[in-house]
Protein backbone atom coordinates (compact mmCIF):
# COMPACT_ATOMS: atom_id res chain seq x y z
CA UNK A 1 0.00 0.00 0.00
CA UNK A 2 3.02 2.31 0.08
CA UNK A 3 2.05 3.97 -3.20
CA UNK A 4 -1.18 5.20 -1.59
CA UNK A 5 0.28 6.33 1.71
CA UNK A 6 0.44 9.99 2.66
CA UNK A 7 2.53 10.45 5.80
CA UNK A 8 2.74 13.43 8.18
CA UNK A 9 6.27 14.05 6.89
CA UNK A 10 4.89 14.95 3.46
CA UNK A 11 2.35 17.66 4.16
CA UNK A 12 2.95 20.39 1.63
CA UNK A 13 -0.02 21.41 -0.48
CA UNK A 14 -0.01 21.93 -4.24
CA UNK A 15 1.01 25.57 -3.82
CA UNK A 16 3.97 24.59 -1.63
CA UNK A 17 2.45 25.59 1.71
CA UNK A 18 2.21 23.47 4.84
CA UNK A 19 -1.34 22.58 5.88
CA UNK A 20 -1.16 22.98 9.65
CA UNK A 21 -4.03 20.51 10.07
CA UNK A 22 -1.54 17.81 9.06
CA UNK A 23 0.64 18.44 12.13
CA UNK A 24 0.26 17.14 15.66
CA UNK A 25 1.62 19.29 18.49
CA UNK A 26 5.16 17.90 18.36
CA UNK A 27 5.32 18.47 14.61
CA UNK A 28 3.77 21.91 14.98
CA UNK A 29 6.44 22.92 17.48
CA UNK A 30 9.18 21.68 15.14
CA UNK A 31 7.62 23.71 12.33
CA UNK A 32 7.63 26.88 14.45
CA UNK A 33 11.19 26.17 15.58
CA UNK A 34 12.21 26.07 11.92
CA UNK A 35 10.58 29.50 11.56
CA UNK A 36 12.76 30.78 14.41
CA UNK A 37 9.83 30.95 16.84
CA UNK A 38 9.35 29.71 20.41
CA UNK A 39 7.33 26.50 20.97
CA UNK A 40 4.53 28.35 22.79
CA UNK A 41 3.64 30.06 19.51
CA UNK A 42 2.69 26.66 18.11
CA UNK A 43 0.42 26.10 21.12
CA UNK A 44 -1.23 29.49 20.58
CA UNK A 45 -1.96 28.75 16.93
CA UNK A 46 -3.27 25.26 17.73
CA UNK A 47 -5.64 26.76 20.29
CA UNK A 48 -7.03 29.13 17.65
CA UNK A 49 -7.32 26.30 15.14
CA UNK A 50 -9.12 23.79 17.32
CA UNK A 51 -10.75 25.66 20.20
CA UNK A 52 -12.21 28.34 17.93
CA UNK A 53 -12.15 26.54 14.55
CA UNK A 54 -10.21 29.47 13.14
CA UNK A 55 -8.59 29.11 9.72
CA UNK A 56 -7.61 32.76 9.23
CA UNK A 57 -4.24 33.87 10.63
CA UNK A 58 -5.38 37.51 10.66
CA UNK A 59 -8.01 36.64 13.28
CA UNK A 60 -5.40 35.28 15.71
CA UNK A 61 -5.14 38.48 17.69
CA UNK A 62 -2.53 37.33 20.23
CA UNK A 63 -0.09 36.50 17.42
CA UNK A 64 2.06 39.45 16.32
CA UNK A 65 1.61 40.81 12.81
CA UNK A 66 5.09 39.84 11.67
CA UNK A 67 4.51 36.18 12.53
CA UNK A 68 1.04 36.26 11.02
CA UNK A 69 2.54 37.55 7.80
CA UNK A 70 5.21 34.87 7.86
CA UNK A 71 2.59 32.16 8.41
CA UNK A 72 0.50 33.36 5.49
CA UNK A 73 3.52 32.96 3.23
CA UNK A 74 4.40 29.38 4.17
CA UNK A 75 1.32 27.79 5.74
CA UNK A 76 -2.44 27.46 5.60
CA UNK A 77 -5.27 25.87 7.56
CA UNK A 78 -7.38 24.01 5.02
CA UNK A 79 -10.04 21.53 6.10
CA UNK A 80 -11.93 19.49 3.51
CA UNK A 81 -15.21 21.07 2.44
CA UNK A 82 -18.73 19.77 3.01
CA UNK A 83 -20.37 19.33 -0.38
CA UNK A 84 -23.67 17.83 0.76
CA UNK A 85 -25.64 17.65 3.99
CA UNK A 86 -28.52 15.33 4.86
CA UNK A 87 -30.56 15.50 8.06
CA UNK A 88 -32.41 12.56 9.52
CA UNK A 89 -35.75 12.74 11.27
CA UNK A 90 -33.97 11.59 14.46
CA UNK A 91 -31.50 14.51 14.42
CA UNK A 92 -28.58 12.65 12.86
CA UNK A 93 -26.65 14.65 10.25
CA UNK A 94 -24.58 13.13 7.44
CA UNK A 95 -22.02 15.23 5.62
CA UNK A 96 -20.44 14.27 2.31
CA UNK A 97 -16.94 15.73 2.44
CA UNK A 98 -14.78 16.34 -0.62
CA UNK A 99 -11.29 14.83 -0.52
CA UNK A 100 -9.75 15.62 -3.87
CA UNK A 101 -12.10 14.45 -6.60
CA UNK A 102 -13.88 11.98 -4.29
CA UNK A 103 -16.07 12.01 -1.21
CA UNK A 104 -16.08 10.44 2.20
CA UNK A 105 -18.91 10.58 4.70
CA UNK A 106 -18.99 11.85 8.27
CA UNK A 107 -21.94 11.40 10.62
CA UNK A 108 -22.99 13.53 13.61
CA UNK A 109 -25.19 11.67 16.11
CA UNK A 110 -26.71 13.80 18.89
CA UNK A 111 -28.09 12.21 22.05
CA UNK A 112 -29.49 13.55 25.29
CA UNK A 113 -26.18 13.95 27.11
CA UNK A 114 -23.60 13.79 24.32
CA UNK A 115 -22.95 14.01 20.60
CA UNK A 116 -20.84 11.49 18.72
CA UNK A 117 -19.02 12.08 15.44
CA UNK A 118 -18.35 9.07 13.22
CA UNK A 119 -15.19 9.73 11.19
CA UNK A 120 -13.78 8.06 8.05
CA UNK A 121 -10.13 6.98 7.73
CA UNK A 122 -9.91 5.88 4.09
CA UNK A 123 -11.53 6.56 0.73
CA UNK A 124 -13.37 3.26 0.46
CA UNK A 125 -12.17 0.02 2.04
CA UNK A 126 -10.31 -3.04 0.79
CA UNK A 127 -11.43 -5.56 3.42
CA UNK A 128 -14.62 -6.57 1.58
CA UNK A 129 -16.82 -7.30 4.59
CA UNK A 130 -19.91 -8.67 2.90
CA UNK A 131 -22.51 -6.82 4.97
CA UNK A 132 -20.95 -3.34 4.63
CA UNK A 133 -21.83 -0.81 1.94
CA UNK A 134 -18.43 0.89 2.09
CA UNK A 135 -16.69 -2.36 1.17
CA UNK A 136 -18.74 -2.62 -2.01
CA UNK A 137 -17.28 0.68 -3.24
CA UNK A 138 -13.73 -0.67 -3.42
CA UNK A 139 -10.65 1.14 -2.15
CA UNK A 140 -8.85 4.21 -3.45
CA UNK A 141 -6.45 5.63 -0.87
CA UNK A 142 -5.69 6.49 2.72
CA UNK A 143 -6.85 9.82 4.09
CA UNK A 144 -4.08 12.13 5.28
CA UNK A 145 -4.08 13.65 8.76
CA UNK A 146 -5.71 16.90 7.64
CA UNK A 147 -8.51 14.96 5.95
CA UNK A 148 -9.21 12.96 9.11
CA UNK A 149 -8.93 15.69 11.75
CA UNK A 150 -10.48 18.03 9.18
CA UNK A 151 -13.74 16.08 9.44
CA UNK A 152 -13.83 16.83 13.17
CA UNK A 153 -12.80 20.46 12.56
CA UNK A 154 -15.48 20.97 9.92
CA UNK A 155 -18.19 19.33 12.03
CA UNK A 156 -17.21 21.34 15.11
CA UNK A 157 -17.35 24.56 13.09
CA UNK A 158 -20.80 23.73 11.71
CA UNK A 159 -22.22 22.65 15.07
CA UNK A 160 -20.61 25.58 16.87
CA UNK A 161 -22.18 28.03 14.45
CA UNK A 162 -25.61 26.47 14.96
CA UNK A 163 -25.90 26.57 18.75
CA UNK A 164 -29.25 28.30 18.51
CA UNK A 165 -30.70 25.07 17.11
CA UNK A 166 -29.84 23.18 20.27
CA UNK A 167 -27.21 20.97 18.64
CA UNK A 168 -24.68 19.67 21.14
CA UNK A 169 -20.92 20.10 20.84
CA UNK A 170 -18.95 17.00 19.88
CA UNK A 171 -18.18 14.96 23.00
CA UNK A 172 -17.15 11.65 21.41
CA UNK A 173 -15.35 10.60 18.22
CA UNK A 174 -15.54 7.10 16.79
CA UNK A 175 -13.26 5.92 14.01
CA UNK A 176 -16.07 3.84 12.53
CA UNK A 177 -16.70 5.58 9.23
CA UNK A 178 -15.38 4.54 5.84
CA UNK A 179 -12.22 2.44 5.87
CA UNK A 180 -10.14 0.29 8.22
CA UNK A 181 -8.27 2.64 10.58
CA UNK A 182 -5.47 0.18 11.31
CA UNK A 183 -4.53 0.15 7.63
CA UNK A 184 -3.80 3.88 7.91
CA UNK A 185 -1.95 4.09 11.22
CA UNK A 186 0.56 6.71 10.06
CA UNK A 187 -2.25 9.22 9.59
CA UNK A 188 -4.92 7.98 12.01
CA UNK A 189 -2.67 8.09 15.09
CA UNK A 190 -1.53 11.74 14.64
CA UNK A 191 -5.16 12.71 13.99
CA UNK A 192 -6.26 11.02 17.21
CA UNK A 193 -3.38 12.71 19.06
CA UNK A 194 -4.88 16.05 18.01
CA UNK A 195 -8.31 14.92 19.19
CA UNK A 196 -6.83 14.17 22.64
CA UNK A 197 -4.46 17.15 22.88
CA UNK A 198 -5.49 19.94 25.26
CA UNK A 199 -4.51 22.42 22.55
CA UNK A 200 -6.47 20.34 20.04
CA UNK A 201 -10.02 19.18 20.72
CA UNK A 202 -9.16 18.07 24.27
CA UNK A 203 -11.26 14.90 24.29
CA UNK A 204 -10.79 12.24 26.93
CA UNK A 205 -9.06 9.09 25.67
CA UNK A 206 -12.15 7.19 26.79
CA UNK A 207 -14.20 9.26 24.37
CA UNK A 208 -12.13 8.52 21.27
CA UNK A 209 -12.81 5.03 19.95
CA UNK A 210 -11.03 3.13 17.19
CA UNK A 211 -12.88 0.23 15.59
CA UNK A 212 -11.05 -2.52 13.72
CA UNK A 213 -11.97 -5.66 11.80
CA UNK A 214 -8.80 -7.40 12.93
CA UNK A 215 -5.54 -6.25 11.34
CA UNK A 216 -3.58 -7.97 14.09
CA UNK A 217 -0.01 -6.72 13.42
CA UNK A 218 -1.26 -3.13 13.35
CA UNK A 219 -3.27 -3.67 16.54
CA UNK A 220 -0.10 -4.90 18.24
CA UNK A 221 1.62 -1.70 17.10
CA UNK A 222 -1.27 0.59 18.10
CA UNK A 223 -0.86 -0.17 21.78
CA UNK A 224 2.66 1.24 21.71
CA UNK A 225 1.59 4.40 19.86
CA UNK A 226 -1.53 5.72 21.57
CA UNK A 227 -4.13 4.84 24.20
CA UNK A 228 -7.73 5.13 23.02
CA UNK A 229 -10.87 3.10 23.50
CA UNK A 230 -11.05 -0.01 21.32
CA UNK A 231 -14.02 -1.61 19.60
CA UNK A 232 -13.70 -4.74 17.49
CA UNK A 233 -15.89 -5.74 14.58
CA UNK A 234 -16.34 -9.41 15.44
CA UNK A 235 -19.74 -10.23 13.90
CA UNK A 236 -19.43 -14.01 14.18
CA UNK A 237 -19.13 -16.66 16.92
CA UNK A 238 -16.81 -18.95 14.93
CA UNK A 239 -14.24 -18.89 12.15
CA UNK A 240 -16.48 -20.61 9.62
CA UNK A 241 -19.01 -17.77 9.60
CA UNK A 242 -16.42 -15.02 10.02
CA UNK A 243 -14.33 -16.32 7.11
CA UNK A 244 -17.38 -15.75 4.92
CA UNK A 245 -18.57 -12.34 6.10
CA UNK A 246 -15.24 -10.78 7.26
CA UNK A 247 -12.63 -12.17 4.83
CA UNK A 248 -9.57 -10.86 6.70
CA UNK A 249 -10.38 -13.59 9.23
CA UNK A 250 -8.82 -16.09 6.81
CA UNK A 251 -5.44 -14.63 7.72
CA UNK A 252 -6.00 -13.47 11.30
CA UNK A 253 -8.55 -15.83 12.82
CA UNK A 254 -10.70 -15.13 15.84
CA UNK A 255 -8.31 -16.72 18.34
CA UNK A 256 -5.40 -14.64 17.03
CA UNK A 257 -7.53 -11.49 16.96
CA UNK A 258 -8.81 -11.87 20.53
CA UNK A 259 -5.31 -12.62 21.82
CA UNK A 260 -4.14 -9.32 20.32
CA UNK A 261 -7.14 -7.56 21.87
CA UNK A 262 -6.27 -8.89 25.32
CA UNK A 263 -2.69 -7.68 24.88
CA UNK A 264 -3.97 -4.21 23.97
CA UNK A 265 -6.20 -4.16 27.05
CA UNK A 266 -3.17 -4.87 29.24
CA UNK A 267 -1.51 -1.71 27.90
CA UNK A 268 -4.60 0.51 27.81
CA UNK A 269 -6.21 2.67 30.47
CA UNK A 270 -8.79 4.12 28.11
CA UNK A 271 -10.78 0.88 27.94
CA UNK A 272 -11.14 0.47 31.71
CA UNK A 273 -10.21 -3.17 31.30
CA UNK A 274 -12.70 -4.23 28.66
CA UNK A 275 -13.25 -4.00 24.93
CA UNK A 276 -16.45 -3.28 23.02
CA UNK A 277 -17.56 -6.16 20.81
CA UNK A 278 -19.54 -5.13 17.72
CA UNK A 279 -21.82 -7.82 16.37
CA UNK A 280 -24.06 -7.11 13.39
CA UNK A 281 -27.22 -9.22 13.38
CA UNK A 282 -27.78 -11.01 10.05
CA UNK A 283 -31.01 -12.96 9.70
CA UNK A 284 -30.39 -16.72 9.98
CA UNK A 285 -26.67 -16.24 9.40
CA UNK A 286 -25.24 -15.44 12.84
CA UNK A 287 -28.29 -14.63 14.97
CA UNK A 288 -29.52 -17.97 16.32
CA UNK A 289 -29.51 -18.88 20.00
CA UNK A 290 -26.88 -21.51 19.22
CA UNK A 291 -24.69 -18.69 17.90
CA UNK A 292 -25.26 -16.73 21.11
CA UNK A 293 -24.10 -19.68 23.21
CA UNK A 294 -21.02 -20.06 20.97
CA UNK A 295 -20.26 -16.35 21.30
CA UNK A 296 -20.52 -16.48 25.08
CA UNK A 297 -18.09 -19.40 25.19
CA UNK A 298 -15.75 -17.62 22.77
CA UNK A 299 -15.60 -14.45 24.86
CA UNK A 300 -15.39 -15.99 28.33
CA UNK A 301 -11.73 -14.96 28.70
CA UNK A 302 -12.06 -11.52 27.08
CA UNK A 303 -13.43 -8.74 29.33
CA UNK A 304 -16.00 -6.98 27.17
CA UNK A 305 -19.36 -5.46 26.61
CA UNK A 306 -21.33 -6.51 23.56
CA UNK A 307 -23.15 -4.22 21.15
CA UNK A 308 -25.70 -6.02 19.00
CA UNK A 309 -26.24 -4.04 15.81
CA UNK A 310 -29.39 -4.52 13.73
CA UNK A 311 -28.12 -4.81 10.16
CA UNK A 312 -28.83 -1.82 7.94
CA UNK A 313 -29.64 -2.88 4.36
CA UNK A 314 -28.21 -1.43 1.16
CA UNK A 315 -28.98 -2.21 -2.51
CA UNK A 316 -27.74 -5.57 -3.73
CA UNK A 317 -26.82 -6.93 -0.30
CA UNK A 318 -27.37 -10.70 0.11
CA UNK A 319 -28.60 -10.53 3.70
CA UNK A 320 -31.73 -9.80 5.66
CA UNK A 321 -32.18 -7.93 8.91
CA UNK A 322 -32.75 -10.03 12.01
CA UNK A 323 -36.20 -9.73 13.51
CA UNK A 324 -36.60 -8.01 16.85
CA UNK A 325 -37.60 -11.31 18.42
CA UNK A 326 -34.42 -13.06 17.24
CA UNK A 327 -32.29 -10.17 18.48
CA UNK A 328 -34.10 -10.24 21.83
CA UNK A 329 -33.55 -13.99 22.27
CA UNK A 330 -29.88 -13.62 21.31
CA UNK A 331 -29.43 -10.80 23.81
CA UNK A 332 -31.06 -12.75 26.64
CA UNK A 333 -28.73 -15.70 26.10
CA UNK A 334 -25.68 -13.45 26.38
CA UNK A 335 -27.03 -11.72 29.49
CA UNK A 336 -27.65 -15.12 31.10
CA UNK A 337 -23.87 -15.61 30.94
CA UNK A 338 -23.33 -12.27 32.67
CA UNK A 339 -22.30 -10.19 29.64
CA UNK A 340 -23.29 -6.54 29.47
CA UNK A 341 -25.29 -6.55 26.24
CA UNK A 342 -26.74 -3.56 24.44
CA UNK A 343 -28.90 -3.53 21.32
CA UNK A 344 -27.72 -0.49 19.43
CA UNK A 345 -30.45 1.94 18.46
CA UNK A 346 -30.39 2.52 14.71
CA UNK A 347 -29.74 6.17 13.91
CA UNK A 348 -29.86 7.94 10.56
CA UNK A 349 -31.00 4.99 8.47
CA UNK A 350 -33.44 7.19 6.56
CA UNK A 351 -30.44 9.07 5.10
CA UNK A 352 -28.17 6.00 4.75
CA UNK A 353 -26.05 7.20 7.67
CA UNK A 354 -26.46 4.14 9.88
CA UNK A 355 -23.79 1.56 10.66
CA UNK A 356 -22.59 -0.16 7.48
CA UNK A 357 -24.40 2.20 5.11
CA UNK A 358 -21.68 4.79 4.40
CA UNK A 359 -20.56 4.74 0.78
CA UNK A 360 -19.25 8.14 -0.29
CA UNK A 361 -17.99 8.53 -3.85
CA UNK A 362 -15.00 6.29 -4.48
CA UNK A 363 -12.90 5.69 -7.57
CA UNK A 364 -11.92 2.06 -6.99
CA UNK A 365 -8.19 1.61 -7.49
CA UNK A 366 -7.92 -1.58 -5.48
CA UNK A 367 -5.99 -4.11 -7.47
CA UNK A 368 -7.14 -7.71 -7.31
CA UNK A 369 -3.76 -8.76 -5.91
CA UNK A 370 -3.92 -6.07 -3.23
CA UNK A 371 -7.31 -7.25 -2.00
CA UNK A 372 -6.02 -10.82 -1.87
CA UNK A 373 -2.92 -9.67 0.00
CA UNK A 374 -4.93 -7.73 2.57
CA UNK A 375 -7.29 -10.66 3.17
CA UNK A 376 -5.02 -13.66 3.00
CA UNK A 377 -1.36 -12.73 3.29
CA UNK A 378 0.87 -10.95 5.78
CA UNK A 379 0.49 -7.18 5.92
CA UNK A 380 3.68 -5.11 6.06
CA UNK A 381 3.13 -2.64 8.88
CA UNK A 382 5.73 -0.30 7.41
CA UNK A 383 3.38 0.10 4.46
CA UNK A 384 0.27 0.54 6.58
From Swiss-Prot:
It catalyses: adenosine(2503) in 23S rRNA + 2 reduced [2Fe-2S]-[ferredoxin] + 2 S-adenosyl-L-methionine = 2-methyladenosine(2503) in 23S rRNA + 5'-deoxyadenosine + L-methionine + 2 oxidized [2Fe-2S]-[ferredoxin] + S-adenosyl-L-homocysteine; adenosine(37) in tRNA + 2 reduced [2Fe-2S]-[ferredoxin] + 2 S-adenosyl-L-methionine = 2-methyladenosine(37) in tRNA + 5'-deoxyadenosine + L-methionine + 2 oxidized [2Fe-2S]-[ferredoxin] + S-adenosyl-L-homocysteine. It holds the Pfam family Radical_SAM. Keywords: 4Fe-4S, Cytoplasm, Disulfide bond, Iron, Iron-sulfur, Metal-binding, Methyltransferase, rRNA processing, S-adenosyl-L-methionine, Transferase, tRNA processing. S-adenosyl-L-methionine binds at residues 179-180, 211, 233-235, 312. Disulfide bonds join 118-355. One of its GO terms (cellular component) is cytoplasm. [4Fe-4S] cluster binds at residues 125, 129, 132. It is an enzyme of class 2 (transferase). The active site is at residues 105, 355. GO terms for molecular function: 4 iron, 4 sulfur cluster binding; metal ion binding; rRNA (adenine(2503)-C2-)-methyltransferase activity; rRNA binding; tRNA (adenine(37)-C2)-methyltransferase activity; tRNA binding. One of its GO terms (biological process) is rRNA base methylation. Residues 111-350 form the Radical SAM core domain. PROSITE patterns: RADICAL_SAM. Binds 1 [4Fe-4S] cluster. The cluster is coordinated with 3 cysteines and an exchangeable S-adenosyl-L-methionine. NCBIfam families: PRK11194.1, rRNA_mod_RlmN. PANTHER family: 23S RRNA METHYLTRANSFERASE, RADICAL SAM CORE DOMAIN-CONTAINING PROTEIN. Specifically methylates position 2 of adenine 2503 in 23S rRNA and position 2 of adenine 37 in tRNAs. m2A2503 modification seems to play a crucial role in the proofreading step occurring at the peptidyl transferase center and thus would serve to optimize ribosomal fidelity. Belongs to the radical SAM superfamily. RlmN family. Reaction proceeds by a ping-pong mechanism involving intermediate methylation of a conserved cysteine residue. This is Dual-specificity RNA methyltransferase RlmN.
Amino acid sequence: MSEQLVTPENVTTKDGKINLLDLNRQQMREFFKDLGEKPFRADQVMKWMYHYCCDNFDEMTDINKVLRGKLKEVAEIRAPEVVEEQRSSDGTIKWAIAVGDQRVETVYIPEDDRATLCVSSQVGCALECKFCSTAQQGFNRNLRVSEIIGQVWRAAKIVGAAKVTGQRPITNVVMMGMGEPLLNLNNVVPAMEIMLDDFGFGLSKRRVTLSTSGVVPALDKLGDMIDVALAISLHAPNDEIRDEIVPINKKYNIETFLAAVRCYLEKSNANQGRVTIEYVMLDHVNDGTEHAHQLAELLKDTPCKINLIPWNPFPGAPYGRSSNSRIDRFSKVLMSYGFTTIVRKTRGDDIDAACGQLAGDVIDRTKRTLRKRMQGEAIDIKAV
